[in-house]
UniProtKB/Swiss-Prot annotation:
Glycosylation, residue list: 87, 112, 193, 253, 348, 367, 563
Domain of life: Eukaryota
Lineage of the organism: Eukaryota, Metazoa, Chordata, Craniata, Vertebrata
Stored PANTHER family: SUSHI DOMAIN-CONTAINING PROTEIN 1
Protein name: Sushi domain-containing protein 1
Bilayer disposition of the protein: Single-pass type I membrane protein
Chain ranges on the Cytoplasmic side, renumbered to this chain: 743-747
Gene Ontology cellular-component terms listed: membrane
Length: 747
C-alpha cells in the first residue's frame, strides 16, 4: 500500500512553490492611479479584493499572474504526480486546477474515480484476489502491489507456461496432477485399486515364489507428477540345502525353490513305517521337515533248514520290498575223530531274497553248528542250526572241487581228496574290467600248490572292478576247472591326496594307485555369489586319466565362490576343495551415443548393468577435454572432482552413483545441473570448449577392482545449458533491481 499524498517529504518540497506563488499574487494586487476603477481592469480569471482600503486584482486559485493583464493557468502536475497526488497516482491538469486518478490496481480512499489530495485522500492497493475464480480452475491468487499473481494449488501443475502467471496475459493454466501408471516391480505386483492423483499410494507385494527383505512397499504420487521409485526388491525364494535326517540319506535331484521337494530313504537297517520321508521348501525360505523318521529294523530269521547235505536255507520277515541284506554266517565244525581240532570260519552273503540260501564248503563226516545273523548296522535275532555231514568213500577221487568266496576277494577251494596231505596244484587266471572305462584291463595269472584239503587264496584285486576268475586243477586227468565272478566294492580308503589349485581355475592332485592304471574321476561343482542370490551354477562331469598326478582346468565364472567335490569312481570317499575366481571387467555400459555441436546437451540415460563378471560397485560420469579421449585409460584413478581439478586441461568426475542407488529400469543425468552426485559436483560445461563425456562402471571384490568404460557423448563448442541461461537471466535481473534501488536511495 502507498503512503498518503501529504506526507512530510512532499510537503517540504511544495513550500518554496507556495512562497513563489504568494509573491506573484502580491505583485498583481498593487494599487493603480487615483480615480481608476481597478476592479474593472481585473483579468477574467482574477478577483477584485479590498485590502487595507485598496482594491486589488488577484488571480483566482489555479492561475498565476498580475491579476489585471495576465492570469495564466498554473500546471500543478509539472512537479510530478507523486509530489502532487501521492504514490500510485496519475496527475491531470485542468484550467485553474487539477485532479488525481489512482493507477491500475489501486483505488482512492474516498471511493471516487478522481480526487484532490487536500482532503487526505490517497491511493490504496486493490486486493484482486477477493474475486473468486480469478486464476481459473486449480489456480491460487496471490495479491501484490498494484496487481496479483497466480500459482497452482497443491495437487496441480502449471501447463503451457511457468509460474507465476497472469490469466489475462499468459497461456499458463493449472492441470490436476496425474502420475499415470505406477512403475512395475520385477517379480512383484500391485495390491488392490489405486488412483494416480497427488498423494495417492500403491502397495506392492512379491509374487508367489519370491520374497523381500522388510522394506517400504508403498510408492506415492509426488508433486512432480511422477511416482516414487519403489523400494521393494523381490528375490526368488531359495531354501538352500535340505536338512539332514537321522538315519536317512537324500536321494535324487531336488529344487531349492518354493515348493521344491527333497526325498529321503532310510539307511541300511532302518525303515520308515509311516511312508515316504519328504521335506518341502516353504514361502519362508526354510524347509518344512517331515514328521516321519527312520526307525531301526529288527530282522527275524525263521525256518532255517538244511538241503543237499551242505546247503542252508532260511526265511526273513522284513516289511521292506526286496530288501538287500548282508548276512554273517559263522561255521564251527568238529570232526568225528576227537583228535582233530575244531574248524571255524565265517562266510558273508548279501542278497535281496526273502528265502536266502547258501552252499557251504564243508568237510564230510563232521559235526557243524551254523549261526546266521545280519551284518551291522542291521540287527537281528541270530538263528542256529546243527547238523552232521555224511562220510564219503576215500577211494573215490574224480578231481572235482568247488569254490566259495569270503571277505570279498578271498577264495576257499574244497576238494575231496583221496589222501589227506596229498599235493595239489591250481592255476589261477584273473581278468578284471570296469564298465565305465573302456580301456581298463587288469589281468594276472599264477599257479598255487598246496597240501591242504581246503586251501584259501586271497587275491589282490582293484576296487570297483568286475573280475572273472578261472581256477584249473592241474595234474588231474580231467583238468577240472571252476569259473567264478567277483565284483569288488569301492575302496573304503581315500585314493586322492595332495589336491591343490593353480591358475585360479585349475586343479592337480596325487592318485594313490598302481602306475599307468587308468582311473575315472567324477566332478561335482557348485558355484554361488553372495552379491547375486539368484545365481547358481552346478556342473557334473567325469574325466579319465592314467597319470599319477592328473591336472584339469575348469570352466568357471568370474567373481564366484565354488565348492568342488572330486571322487575316483573306485573309491567311496570324495575330497572337497574350495575355489574363488576373481572378478573381470564388468559388461560395457549400454549407452546411446550423442554428438552435440553448439547446442544444449540432452539428458543422458543411465541403464543398470548386469552383474555378470562380479558385483557392480559404482557408476561414474567423467568429463574430459576432447583431446584426451584417445589417451584416456579406463583403469586410471587420476580423475578428481571439479573443485580439486588443477587445470582446465585435466578431466574431472562430474557424478558418482552407487550401484544400489541406480533403479533397475533407468535414470537420467543432466550434465551441468550444478548438483552433487555423491561427493562430486556436476559443474556446467565451459562455453566454447570441446568435451568428451565417459561413463565408467566399477566392479570391486576381494580387494580387486576392475573397470569398463564407454564414450557417452562428444560436445563441440559447447553452449550454455537452458538451466545455465535461466540462472544468468535471473542474476542479471537481480543486478538491475539492486542498481535501481541504489539510484533512488541516492536521490
Amino acid at each position: 500500500m502507498g503512503r498518503g499524498p501529504w506526507d512530510a517529504g512532499p510537503s517540504r518540497r511544495l513550500l518554496p512553490l507556495l512562497l513563489l506563488l504568494g509573491l506573484a499574487r502580491g505583485a498583481a494586487g498593487a494599487p493603480g492611479p487615483d480615480g481608476l476603477d481597478v476592479c474593472a481592469t481585473c483579468h477574467e480569471h482574477a478577483t477584485c479584493q479590498q485590502r487595507e482600503g485598496k482594491k486589488i486584482c488577484i488571480c483566482n486559485y489555479g492561475f498565476v499572474g498580475n491579476g489585471r493583464t495576465q492570469c495564466v493557468d498554473k500546471n500543478e502536475c509539472q512537479f510530478g504526480a507523486t509530489l502532487v497526488c501521492g504514490n500510485h497516482t496519475s496527475c491531470h491538469n485542468t484550467p485553474g486546477g487539477f485532479y488525481c486518478i489512482c493507477l491500475e490496481g489501486y483505488r482512492a480512499t474516498n471511493n471516487n474515480k478522481t480526487f484532490i489530495p487536500n482532503d487526505g485522500t490517497f491511493c490504496t492497493d486493490i486486493d484482486e484476489c477477493e474475486v473468486s475464480g480469478l486464476c481459473r480452475h486449480g489456480g491460487r491468487c496471490v495479491n501484490t502491489h498494484g496487481s496479483f499473481e497466480c500459482y497452482c494449488m497443491d495437487g496441480y501443475l502449471p501447463r503451457n507456461g511457468p509460474e507465476p502467471f497472469h490469466p489475462t496475459t499468459d497461456a499458463t493454466s493449472c492441470t490436476e496432477i496425474d502420475c499415470g501408471t505406477p512403475p512395475e516391480v520385477p517379480d512383484g505386483y500391485i495390491i488392490g485399486n489405486y488412483t494416480s492423483s497427488l498423494g495417492s499410494q500403491v502397495r506392492y507385494a512379491c509374487r508367489e515364489g519370491f520374497f523381500s527383505v522388510p522394506e517400504d512397499t508403498v510408492s506415492s504420487c509426488t508433486g512432480l507428477g511422477t511416482w516414487e521409485s519403489p523400494k521393494l526388491h523381490c528375490q526368488e525364494i531359495n531354501c538352500g540345502n535340505p536338512p539332514e535326517m537321522r538315519h536317512a540319506i537324500l536321494v535324487g535331484n531336488h529344487s531349492s525353490r518354493l515348493g521344491g521337494v527333497a526325498r529321503y530313504v532310510c539307511q541300511e537297517g532302518f525303515e520308515s513305517p509311516g511312508g515316504k520321508i519328504t521335506s518341502v521348501c516353504t514361502e519362508k525360505g526354510t524347509w518344512r521337515e517331515s514328521t516321519l523318521t527312520c526307525t531301526e529294523i529288527l530282522t527275524k530269521i525263521n525256518d532255517v533248514s538244511l538241503f543237499n547235505d551242505t546247503c542252508v536255507r532260511w526265511q526273513i520277515n522284513s516289511r521292506r520290498i526286496n530288501p538287500k541284506i548282508s548276512y554273517v554266517i559263522s561255521i564251527k565244525g568238529q570232526r568225528l575223530d576227537p583228535m582233530e581240532s575244531v574248524r571255524e570260519e565265517t562266510v558273508n552273503l548279501t542278497t535281496d531274497s526273502r528265502t536266502p540260501e547258501v552252499c557251504l564248503a564243508l568237510y564230510p563226516g563232521t559235526n557243524y553248528t551254523v549261526n546266521i545273523s545280519t551284518a551291522p548296522p542291521r540287527r537281528s535275532m541270530p538263528a542256529v542250526i546243527g547238523f552232521q555231514t555224511a562220510e564219503v568213500d576215500l577211494l573215490e577221487d574224480d578231481g572235482s572241487f568247488n569254490i566259495s568266496i569270503f571277505n570279498e576277494t578271498c577264495l576257499k577251494l574244497n576238494r575231496r581228496s583221496r589222501k589227506v596231505g596229498s599235493e595239489h596244484m591250481y592255476q589261477f587266471t584273473v581278468l578284471g574290467q570296469r564298465w565305465y572305462l573302456a580301456n581298463f584291463s587288469h589281468a594276472t595269472s599264477f599257479n598255487f600248490t598246496t597240501r591242504e584239503q581246503v586251501p584259501v587264496v586271497c587275491l589282490d584285486l582293484y576296487p570297483t572292478t568286475d573280475y572273472t576268475v578261472n581256477v584249473t586243477l592241474l595234474r588231474s586227468p580231467k583238468r577240472h576247472s571252476v569259473q567264478i565272478t567277483i565284483a569288488t566294492p569301492p575302496a573304503v580308503k581315500q585314493t586322492i591326496s595332495n589336491i591343490s589349485g593353480f591358475n585360479e581355475t585349475c586343479l592337480r592332485w596325487r592318485s594313490i594307485k598302481t602306475a599307468d592304471m587308468e582311473e575315472m574321476y567324477l566332478f561335482h561343482i557348485w558355484g554361488q555369489r553372495w552379491y547375486q542370490k539368484e545365481f547358481a551354477q552346478e556342473m557334473t562331469f567325469n574325466i579319465s586319466s592314467s597319470s599319477r598326478d592328473p591336472e584339469v582346468c575348469l570352466d568357471l565364472r568370474p567373481g564366484t565362490n565354488y565348492n568342488v567335490s572330486l571322487r575316483a569312481l573306485s573309491s567311496e570317499l570324495p575330497v572337497v576343495i574350495s575355489l574363488t575366481t576373481q572378478i573381470t571387467e564388468p559388461p560395457l555400459p549400454e549407452v546411446e551415443f550423442f554428438t552435440v555441436h553448439r547446442g544444449p546437451l540432452p539428458r543422458l540415460r543411465l541403464r543398470k548393468a548386469k552383474e555378470k563378471n562380479g558385483p557392480i560397485s559404482s557408476y561414474q560420469v567423467l568429463v574430459l577435454p576432447l583431446a584426451l579421449q584417445s589417451t584416456f585409460s579406463c583403469d586410471s584413478e587420476g580423475a578428481s572432482s571439479f573443485f580439486s581439478n588443477a587445470s582446465d586441461a585435466d578431466g574431472y568426475v562430474a557424478a558418482e552413483l552407487l550401484a544400489k542407488d541406480v533403479p533397475d529400469d533407468a535414470m537420467e543425468i543432466p550434465i551441468g545441473d550444478r548438483l552433487y552426485y555423491g561427493e562430486y559436483y556436476n559443474a556446467p560445461l565451459k562455453r566454447g570448449s570441446d568435451y568428451c563425456i565417459i561413463l565408467r562402471i566399477t566392479s570391486e571384490w576381494n580387494k580387486v577392482r576392475r573397470h569398463s568404460c564407454a564414450v557417452w557423448a562428444q560436445v563441440k563448442d559447447s553452449s550454455l545449458m537452458l538451466l545455465q541461461m535461466a540462472g544468468v537471466g535471473l542474476g542479471s535481473l537481480a543486478v538491475v533491481i539492486i542498481l535501481t534501488f541504489l539510484s533512488f536511495s541516492a536521490v
